[in-house]
């Protein structure tokens, strides 16, 4: 039986943890890296490293096409996205699966339905579960957000809507 090959589509500590676990499972590990991470520890600990190019995350770790190409060119059997970057990107998961490579993570449909926090709250409510108190529609004005926060109780997590062209997501904890 040939050893399975896992491409880790992430960097740093996240990649190191995945590499350690993968080696415990006797998987051949493939790290990816950008210009900024050429000498990073995860590239040294992996069995193989694949150069993505670019120095910015948008040019490397957030570049779906480059990561799919890396998985193909390295003959990866599995792709682990880690977290952040493209881990919550349904299109990335779908592209990996379309190439016949196993995606380690939620199904693309699940990522899509859970990626929109308001839609995921509605879905959870629809199946009879009680979501954590929160909004069912986004606040357009600060006064709406303050009113809602006061009704839920502090602290609250204030989450910005993703900016579609960058896939950036951010949140802030508000204590009052």
Please place each PLM-identified region on the residue numbering.
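ATP-binding N-terminal substructure of ATP-dependent carboxylate-amine bond-forming enzymes
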Residues: 1-126, 139-147
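Acidic active-site catalytic centers that drive phospho-/nucleotidyl reactions
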Residues: 80, 84, 159, 172
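ATP-grasp fold ATP-binding core
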Residues: 124, 148-168
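Single conserved hydrophobic/aromatic residue that forms the stacking wall/gate
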Residues: 167-176
């Amino acid at each position: 039986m040939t050893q399975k090959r896992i491409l880790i589509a992430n960097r740093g500590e996240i990649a190191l943890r995945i590499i350690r676990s993968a080696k415990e499972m006797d998987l051949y590990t493939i790290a990816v890296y950008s210009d900024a991470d050429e000498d990073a520890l995860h590239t040294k600990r992996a069995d193989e490293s694949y150069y993505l190019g670019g120095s910015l995350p948008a040019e490397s770790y957030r570049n779906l096409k480059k990561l799919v190409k890396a998985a193909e060119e390295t003959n990866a059997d599995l792709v682990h996205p880690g977290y952040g970057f493209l881990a919550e990107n349904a299109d990335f998961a779908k592209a990996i699966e379309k190439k016949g490579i196993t995606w380690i993570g939620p199904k693309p449909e699940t990522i899509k339905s859970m990626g929109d926090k308001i839609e995921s709250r509605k879905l959870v409510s629809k199946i009879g579960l009680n979501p954590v108190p929160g909004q069912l529609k986004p606040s357009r004005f600060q006064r709406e957000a303050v009113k809602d926060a006061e009704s839920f109780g502090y602290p609250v997590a204030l989450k910005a809507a993703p900016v579609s062209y960058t896939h950036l997501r951010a949140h802030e904890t508000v204590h009052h």
